[in-house]
Amino acid sequence: MVDMDRISISLPTNLLAEFDEIIEERGYASRSEAIRDSIRDYLIKHKWIHSLEGHRAGTISIIYDHHSTDVMEKLTTIQHDYEKLIVATIHMHLDHDHCMEVVLVKGDASDIKDLTDKLTSQKGVKQVKLTVMVPGGNIPQ
């Protein structure tokens, strides 16, 4: 049998309710199993992102609560720190509280990963998705 650690987490009520719906829909035996599965998916994604190498082009999509303290200023400052990597940004208002930014990037994969990590860790950021491609002539035929 695998050793298990018991942990406690705090979640917003609506997030837990939505997660519980998915647990029921997918037929998980328990909430713990669903959380373990989610953590496994997160670890796989993390390993994939951190195994990227070489020159890449892509997008970093960010959803954030613009009412959160200084989040827009922090995101802008971080983007200015990576100005050589960022080709363009698109800003969209999703609703009264939330905005989405799509950051077009081109450069070394490790720099793209660093930028993504810094954006992800900001308070008020709800979701970040990195999509990368091999630019130009490096695409396998």
Curated annotation (Swiss-Prot):
A Pfam family that the UniProt record links to this protein: NikR_C
Family annotation (SUPFAM superfamilies): ACT-like, Ribbon-helix-helix
GO molecular function: DNA binding; DNA-binding transcription factor activity; nickel cation binding
Residue stretches spanning the membrane: none
InterPro entries noted in UniProt: Acetolactate_synth/TF_NikR_C, ACT-like_dom_sf, Arc_rbn_hlx_hlx, CopG, CopG/NikR_regulator, Ni_resp_reg_NikR, Ribbon_hlx_hlx, TF_NikR_Ni-bd_C
Superkingdom of the source species: Archaea
GO BP term, pick one: response to nickel cation
Keywords: DNA-binding, Metal-binding, Nickel, Transcription, Transcription regulation
Residues annotated to bind Ni(2+): 80, 91, 93, 99
Cofactor(s) for this UniProt protein: Ni(2+)
Disulfide bonds: none
Bound cofactor: record note: Binds 1 nickel ion per subunit.
CDD domains tied to this protein: RHH_NikR_HicB-like
Chain's role: Transcriptional regulator.
Family as reported in the entry's similarity comment: Belongs to the transcriptional regulatory CopG/NikR family.
Official protein name in the record: Putative nickel-responsive regulator
Organism: Methanococcus maripaludis (strain C7 / ATCC BAA-1331)
